[in-house]
Amino acid sequence: MRILTKKLVMTIVGVILAAFLVIQLVPYGRAHSNPPVIMEPSWDSPITRDLTVKACFDCHSNQVVWPWYSNIAPISWWVQDHVVEGRSELNFSEWDRNQEEAYEAAETVLEGEMPPSYYKPWSRMSQTDLDNLVTGLEATLGTAKVEEHRDNDDDDD
């Protein structure tokens, strides 16, 4: 009985390992393209641009620094989808096209939706940097409901 269990475990591990190796052959997720930068916004300051690069550019620009793990399936599939979606929502490198949601960028940072908590945990931003990013994005891109959100936060105190 014990030999059968050990054999079953080894078979399962072997199948999982084989499946992992086979999915590495799927070409999707490793075409790490960075199209040319066409035009960036007129930044209100170099600090705003630097903070935006740190917090946003790896998903919302054509200047993505692809991490090493973006070459390993199935993580590569998720990273590729994330960048494609991010660029379609807001792309700081293609400012010549309509960026309908740009005015909401500051709000999403203020509400903690962006940058996502799983995004580059080794380079988390301080609260001061996040506040400066929100202020800079408001000045550069405009505002949505940021003031209303701030007023609601003040009411909670």
PLM regions with names:
Residues 31-52:
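Electrostatic cytochrome c docking/interface patches
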Residues 52-64, 114, 133:
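The canonical Cys-X-X-Cys-His
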Residues 82-83, 144-157:
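Extracytoplasmic/periplasmic C-terminal soluble domains
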Residues 10-27:
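Hydrophobic membrane-insertion alpha-helices, especially the h-region
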